[in-house]
């Protein structure tokens, strides 16, 4: 799946899922956020991408502005904005391809946050692999807390941290790999997975970028 198709697919699913829900529903995997605030973020990302406001992309202040700018709007107004801007972002995805894959990663991650908030599992398709390809590259370049190699295999994607032996490895379903790599699982849950090797020295690797596993 290409980035444009992935973004269009995930956006469509999120808009469908958000239709008719209680805007004030908490999002457990995004502490302090409601569904409206989650949708304000993804809608705000679309607007910022189109306006070239990406110098601070992914930072807390950047996200906070997106949410605050839509605080006085209804959920329908927020999603209505995304309905209007989404097709323009699709065109940008066609032009930039994998150069905008971080957008897919963010949107896929938040689809799962939304699904968790309303108890509607799903969304496990090729868009997740587009997201994982970007995540694997970003994760690989982050700080290595110990010697050896940490390897997560998920579908056609391999996320590798470090170099050499010993190798600590695991095979996960793509959505499970996304959850583990985006702070949606606690360190105790990560450690309890069926690792081949001792993952404990690698646990700091699961705190990276904006992602902090819950207590």
PLM ranges: what are they?
Residues 2-40, 44:
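N-terminal "assembly arms/tails" that initiate or stabilize quaternary assembly
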Residues 34-35, 74, 173:
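Short, structural beta-strand-to-alpha-helix junction motif
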Residues 67-85:
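A short, structured beta-strand-centered segment in the mid-to-C-terminal lobe
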Residues 1-3, 20-21, 25-31, 54-64, ...:
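Structured surface interface patches that mediate subunit assembly and partner/cofactor docking
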Residues 36-63:
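Conserved alpha-helical segments that form or flank metal/cofactor-binding pockets of metalloenzymes
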């Amino acid at each position: 799946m290409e980035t444009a198709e992935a973004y269009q697919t995930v956006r469509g699913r999120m808009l469908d899922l958000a239709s008719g829900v209680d805007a004030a529903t908490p999002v457990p995997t995004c502490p302090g956020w409601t569904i409206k605030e989650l949708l304000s973020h993804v809608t705000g990302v679309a607007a910022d991408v189109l306006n070239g406001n990406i110098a601070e992309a992914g930072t807390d202040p950047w996200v906070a502005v997106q949410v605050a700018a839509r605080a006085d709007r209804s959920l329908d107004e927020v999603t209505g904005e995304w309905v209007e801007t989404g097709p323009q972002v699709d065109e940008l995805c066609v032009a930039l391809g994998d150069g905008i894959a971080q957008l897919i990663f963010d949107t896929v991650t938040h689809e799962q946050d939304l699904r968790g908030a309303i108890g509607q599992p799903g969304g496990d398709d090729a868009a997740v692999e587009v997201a994982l390809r970007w995540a694997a590259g970003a994760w690989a370049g982050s700080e290595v807390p110990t010697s050896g190699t940490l390897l997560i295999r998920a579908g056609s994607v391999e996320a590798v941290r470090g170099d050499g032996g010993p190798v600590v490895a695991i095979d996960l379903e793509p959505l499970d790999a996304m959850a583990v790599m985006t702070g949606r699982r606690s360190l105790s849950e990560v450690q309890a997975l069926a690792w081949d090797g001792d993952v404990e020295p690698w646990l700091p690797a699961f705190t990276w970028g904006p992602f902090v596993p819950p207590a």
